Amino acid sequence: MIASGPPPRVYWTSLIFLLLACCLLPTGAQGQTYQVRVEPKDPVVPFGEPLVVNCTLDCPGPGLISLETALSKEPHSRGLGWAAFRLTNVTGDMEILCSGICNKSQVVGFSNITVFGFPKRVELAPLPLWQPVGEELNLSCLVSGGAPRAHLSVVLLRGEEELGRQPLGKEEPAKVTFMVQPRREDHGTNFSCRSELDLRSQGLELFQNTSAPRKLQTYAMPKTAPRLVFPRFWEMETSWPVNCSLNGLFPASEAHIQLALGNQMLNATVVSHADTLTATATAKTEQEGTQEIVCNVTLGVENRETRESLVAYRFQGPNLNLSESNATEGTPVTVTCAAGPQVQVMLDGVPAAVPGQPAQLQLKATEMDDRRTFFCNATLKVHGVTLHRNRSIQLRVLYGPTIDRAKCPQRLMWKEKTMHILQCQARGNPNPQLQCLREGSKFKVPVGIPFLVLLNYSGTYSCQAASSRGTDKMLVMMDVQGRNPVTINIVLGVLAILGLVTLAAASVYVFWVQRQHDIYHLTPRSTRWRLTSTQPVTVAEELS
């Protein structure tokens, strides 16, 4: 590998040598008709490689041939009219001179050596850790060494795509800068620099060298702040949900989100979907008063933060108690509704005298109080907001069984082979067992369910409700009426006779009506006037 050009010492040595050579030439030599050929002519040589130079004198009777150069040289071979020299270490561009004697005159020939070398280093300057989408970004390619610079250029690559190309300057090391506008799709894309040494015009080839790639990370952060969702009023020592989200992030999966309550970091569950990042946590506090909850979202080199306040309060109670939850009928019962300081309680619509004091209700347990529900309402004012909490409790009263006379008739009259329900009911606490048994036979009739009534169900039944609190009895008379076949036959006979009589009467009536249409009333014959028929044909027809 070589530097961008030959050392300054080589240039100065060559220049001095050429000036001296020109000055020493005889006048006749400057107008020479003979020449010295230098081969190869204007060669392109790899840096540090040896080069064999052949000097040939085109004249009859050639004399001594020599090679003048500042480079290290050694004789290689020689013949009539020619001499070859080996340059052992070509490290820079320079002009070499071959000279010889022809007809006692000195003639010279020149050749320019061009040294080429690949860059020692091709590197893409470090990229920013994160680059905002759409903002201009300057990417720099650094190249050390390489020659000839006139044939050396630098290409910026995005993956395998060529983004730009620039010639390489002469400074050492050389720096070439390209401007790009990163896109979202450039996130995670590799960028690199490629040097190109194009020696195809010198009969060689195109030499390329690519730097190590660097990955670009792009991001997009919205201008809006995260959205916090949580209850504004928190009861102490109770867990509450906290939710924070931010839309418009890219890439959302690379963003970081934190939730904090005061100085306490919350253990949040983070989920990213499309361009949205969401954090969910549960939190509780043991400190009463106003506190701050913070949500912070970081992406790239930017962050967005939201701070909001909450109020933590202590709401003790209400506690609703019964002096006897299962009271015997007739015993006194005290109902108490109590809560913490500054809490106003109300028992069944009756408030306590002052906040912080309990409310009480006293009663004597009766059957009507069984399953009675008492309600306690507690209110607490926090920063101008009234908070409510309710409790309820049920009283059970123990009392003996009672059969409901209104629903259990003492006398029943039913038809045989019909479906009926004995609607007797009993109340009490504990719930009594009710059964109805026929006196004498202890035959049990179903209670409360449909059954088929038979003729032998007739009789007097003793219905008894029993529980651990006592018993209650009542008598029910059941009269089942059977179906009589004789009576049915008599009824059918009577109906048949009535039908015959009706039919006979109808026949007589019809006959009488028809006879009425066939009767003619005639006036007795007069001795004076002779009767003549006004309708002789009709009468004749009727008589006939």
Swiss-Prot record:
The chain crosses the membrane at residues 487-511. It is found in: Membrane. One of its GO terms (cellular component) is plasma membrane. It holds the Pfam family ICAM1_3_5_D2. Glycans are attached at residues 54, 89, 103, 112, 138, 190, 209, 243, 267, 296, 321, 326, 377, 390, 456. One of its GO terms (molecular function) is integrin binding. This is Intercellular adhesion molecule 3.
